[in-house]
Amino acid sequence: MTIIFQLTLFALIAVSFLLVIGVPVVFASPSGWTENKGTVFSGVGIWFLLVFAVGILNSFVI
């Protein structure tokens, strides 16, 4: 169970890093928001899913 928690936590950190870099780039480009709106929303949805998964898995690890 610990390895699943660690992999999920790593995925959360990786997605967070990608969103921190990617979202400002999307907003800075001239037509980036209209073209990449779905990608940004997908990334945010995955981020929320991973936050809840880490919270649930944390109760099993500790």
UniProtKB/Swiss-Prot annotation:
InterPro entries: PSII_PsbZ (IPR002644), PSII_PsbZ_sf (IPR036512). Keywords: Chloroplast, Membrane, Photosynthesis, Photosystem II, Plastid, Reaction center, Thylakoid, Transmembrane, Transmembrane helix. It comes from Oltmannsiellopsis viridis (Marine flagellate). Its main location: plastid. The chain crosses the membrane at residues 8-28, 41-61. May control the interaction of photosystem II (PSII) cores with the light-harvesting antenna, regulates electron flow through the 2 photosystem reaction centers. PSII is a light-driven water plastoquinone oxidoreductase, using light energy to abstract electrons from H(2)O, generating a proton gradient subsequently used for ATP formation. The keyword Ion transport does not apply. One of its GO terms (biological process) is photosystem II stabilization. This is Photosystem II reaction center protein Z. It is a multi-pass membrane protein. It is found in: Plastid, Chloroplast thylakoid membrane. GO terms for cellular component: chloroplast thylakoid membrane; photosystem II reaction center. Belongs to the PsbZ family.
